[in-house]
Every structure is written in structure tokens, then in C-alpha cells.
Amino acid sequence: MFENENPNGSWLDEYQNDVRYGLKGKKIIEEISNFQKITIFESNRYGKALLLDNCWMTAEYQEKQYHECIVHPALCGSKEINKVLIIGGGDGGSARECLKYQELKNLDLIEIDKRVVELSQQYLSVIGGNCWKDQRLNLKLTNGINWVKDAKDNSYDVIIIDGSDPKGPAKGLFNKDFFKDCHRILKPDGVLGAQTESPESFEDIHINTVKMIKEVFKYADPLYGYVPIYPSGIWSWTFASIKKPRHLYPIISRANTISKTCQVWSPRWQRGGFDAIPANIERKLQQ
């Protein structure tokens, strides 16, 4: 993390693999929770932003590029969406997108760090919107890995893994045993969606995580899009299904309704995102 004071604000930077990514603005608050360092930063370009352990997580004016794209391929592909699980997602953005679906009856949001939720509600309320007041949302401040391990078989129609980078409290979300438990608790006609890092800035992590999911699920495919505040701007999400590749084929009536509420996601965008796999990444996934 590097800050250079000047009259127009400070540069707040994330360092990854000898590359620096930064935004100019001012720090609002920074604290150490029981799990990680949490920073709220008001950027000149993208509004208020959240950082965990010095890594950009989300920002007000570009968060839809992430949250729409981790949620809708899964919820538009699953046969039913009565019961949905989100692991992580303490900023509320993924929950907000899930709760757009009237068919959804129960949304379990499992966040390990209550301060992420509290600070997001206080400073980033535009991201979560009204999700925190929705009676369908069940917020549990506990360990998501243990929650999945203890859940009953075939418990959920959709599982969204909206964790941070594979370090600190989120490290266990990039583990094969964790994905095996997700497979066990996912209904046969359901869909799993997970953030799987950047194929450019974190190629090894991306390759290893996608391969891991492919080893556990019969059908799994990475989808690629852009998130400006993330290293390199290129990001990925991987979607997986059990009986058939439901994540590749959105239910049209559901997708047409939801896409009208979105700034980025649409069935057409989704097709392009799955097709956008870089040739070198595709070859490495086949090795």
C-alpha cells in the first residue's frame, strides 16, 4: 500500500506481482478487525471503495460489473431458485442481485467478518441497497467453510462463492474439499458460481481453481469480463452444474426479465463472456 499526499487527494495503491494499481482520493476509515484490515476509501473516479488487506474489493460506480456477473449466470441457469447460498459477499452487492428474483424464497448470506457488513452498511449502502431489509435474507456471521461442511445434502438450488483473494479468511474457499462439500449440498439441477481471479494477474491461481472445480463438477466453465479496479481489469467467474451444463443456457423468461434491471449482464453478454477464454488459458486448462 502506498499513499502520496497532494492537494487533489492521495494515491491508494494495491501491489501485485511487481505491478501497482491505484486510485486517487481520500481514506475515510481504516481498521483491523478480528480477521483482516478493512479500508473504506473515497476515490475521485469510482466513488467509495472497499479494500481488504490492501486489496481492492468493490467500488460504488463499477461494482455492477462484478456483482451482476457472478449472480445472474447461476440464477438464470438453475432449474429452481427457491433457496440460495452466498459465501462471503459482506458488501451486499451479490445479495441485492439475488433478491431481484421474485421466485427466490430464502437467501443465506454467510460472512465471517461482521465489520465488513457493518462498514459496508454505513459507508457503501448504495451497493447493498435494500437487501439488508429484505425478509428473505438470512445473514449469518460465521465461517462459510464450516457452514457448507455442516449443511445437509441437496440443500441449495444455487451457491455463490463471493469470497476475497485466496489469503486470510478466504484461503479455504480455494480448496478442493470445500468444492466437494458445495457439490454435495447443491441440488442436482442447481448451479454454482465462484469468483476465480484474473487470468492475467493471477494466472496460476485462476488455472488451479478452475481445474479444481472441473475435477469436482461434471460441467464447469470460466466466464471472463472486466472489473476496472481489479489487477489488469480482467476478471473471471466459474460456473458449474451437475446433471447438465445449465449455466450455459439461461432460462429465457427469467433472463429477459432480469436483464432489464442490469447495467452489464445480459444473455448476449454472458455468451460472449464464456467464449472469451484466452487460447493459452484454454490449453492450460486441458493439460
From Swiss-Prot:
**Which family does the entry's similarity section mention?**
Belongs to the spermidine/spermine synthase family.
**Which reactions fall under this protein's catalytic activity?**
S-adenosyl 3-(methylsulfanyl)propylamine + putrescine = S-methyl-5'-thioadenosine + spermidine + H(+)
EC number of the protein: 2.5.1.16
What PANTHER family does the annotation carry? SPERMIDINE SYNTHASE, SPERMIDINE/SPERMINE SYNTHASE
- Upper lineage ranks? Bacteria, Bacillati, Cyanobacteriota, Cyanophyceae, Synechococcales
Tell me which UniProt keywords the record has, alphabetically: Cytoplasm, Polyamine biosynthesis, Spermidine biosynthesis, Transferase
> What top-level branch of life does the organism fall under?
Bacteria
Q: Where in the cell is it found?
A: Cytoplasm
The entry's active site is 162
Listed binding positions for spermidine are 67, 91
Domain (PABS) spans 9-242
Q: What does this protein do?
A: Catalyzes the irreversible transfer of a propylamine group from the amino donor S-adenosylmethioninamine (decarboxy-AdoMet) to putrescine (1,4-diaminobutane) to yield spermidine.
Question: What are the recorded GO MF terms, alphabetically?
Answer: spermidine synthase activity
Kindly tell me the pathway this chain contributes to: Amine and polyamine biosynthesis; spermidine biosynthesis; spermidine from putrescine: step 1/1
Question: What gene is this protein translated from?
Answer: speE
The protein's name in its UniProt record: Polyamine aminopropyltransferase
According to the UniProt record, one GO cellular component term is: cytoplasm
Q: Which HAMAP family match?
A: Spermidine_synth
The family database entries (CDD domains) matched by this protein are listed as: AdoMet_MTases
